[in-house]
Amino acid sequence: ILLCAKHMEAAVTQSPRSKVAVTGGKVTLSCHQTNNHDYMYWYRQDTGHGLRLIHYSYVADSTEKGDIPDGYKASRPSQENFSLILELASLSQTAVYFCASSGTGGALDTQYFGPGTRLLVL
């Protein structure tokens, strides 16, 4: 019950939940958190694979590259909002994208995940 209550308090939302984009088009995925967390993350998940970190941020107005940043930009205009931008979407960027937030960014710190955004690039 404690985990459920904690989860309900730690809201991370994403928009859109699904999107179809054309190759070469610009795509912006938005994430909003009400946790007052310093750290925010964008991951991608491909079929049959685990999560891979694209970009993260530990403070507003600053972003850092993750493990697979190529082809992506990120923007953290405020504590609550963290966007992932594909300037020129490509077929290889078809995936499910997850945003998460955490308090300290430590290895043992819980990350709270959004519901995911399914992106299909045609």
Curated annotation (Swiss-Prot):
Domain of life, per lineage: Eukaryota
UniProt-listed GO biological process terms: adaptive immune response; cell surface receptor signaling pathway
InterPro entries (alphabetical): Ig-like_dom (IPR007110), Ig-like_dom_sf (IPR036179), Ig-like_fold (IPR013783), Ig_sub (IPR003599), Ig_V-set (IPR013106), TCR_beta_variable (IPR050413)
Pfam families assigned: V-set
SUPFAM superfamilies listed in its UniProt record: Immunoglobulin
Ranges where the record places region D segment: 104-108
Residue ranges of the region described as V segment: 8-103
Keyword field: Adaptive immunity, Disulfide bond, Immunity, Immunoglobulin domain, Receptor, Signal, T cell receptor
Positions of disulphide bridges: 31-99
Range of residues in the leader sequence: 1-7
Region annotated J segment, chain positions: 109-122
GO cellular component: plasma membrane; T cell receptor complex
Note: This sequence was derived from a T-helper clone.
Record protein name field: T-cell receptor beta chain V region C5
Organism: Mus musculus
